[in-house]
Amino acid sequence: MHCPFCGKYDTKVTDSRLVAEGDQVRRRRQCNDCGERFTTYETAELVMPRVIKGDGSRETFDERKLRAGMLRALEKRPVSAESIEAAVERIRQRLRARGEREIEAREIGEEVMRSLKRLDQVAYIRFASVYRRFQDLDEFRAEIDRLAQEPSFSPDDADKR
């Protein structure tokens, strides 16, 4: 690594430590030429899969779209920002863990629905109504009935999934 002070490439690592819950390595370095010390942080570069949209077009995964869709469904609901961010991160981790280069937008929508079902059932119904394009009250009722048949989750369960 080159020295940010003198630009030479002859540096040595003097200390390495895990930080950020083990997701990052902090390294103290020293330039062998000018003697200056500096810190670098190393993280794994994890590429998200490309998204195959319903019309067959492809686009880069956009975490902002994921978060915006969830926030829209959770608007004015008693769910903390921390819980929402944790859910977004869990979805990202599950998508990355698949190891696929591409994923259908439908599958991302299903992941969002699973997360919302655990976070807030009203938000789940809101999202499902748009995502599944409910046309009338009967479709709402059917989804609510399906939801009522499933075992309920406590907020603590959402953190475990």
From Swiss-Prot:
The keyword ATP-binding is assigned to this record: yes
Domain ATP-cone: 49-139
InterPro entries: ATP-cone_dom (IPR005144), NrdR-like_N (IPR055173), RNR_NrdR-like (IPR003796)
UniProt cofactor(s): Zn(2+)
The keyword Manganese is assigned to this record: no
One GO MF term: zinc ion binding
UniProt keyword terms in alphabetical order: ATP-binding, DNA-binding, Metal-binding, Nucleotide-binding, Repressor, Transcription, Transcription regulation, Zinc, Zinc-finger
Chain ranges of zinc fingers (unnamed): 3-34
Family named by the database record: Belongs to the NrdR family.
Protein name per UniProt: Transcriptional repressor NrdR
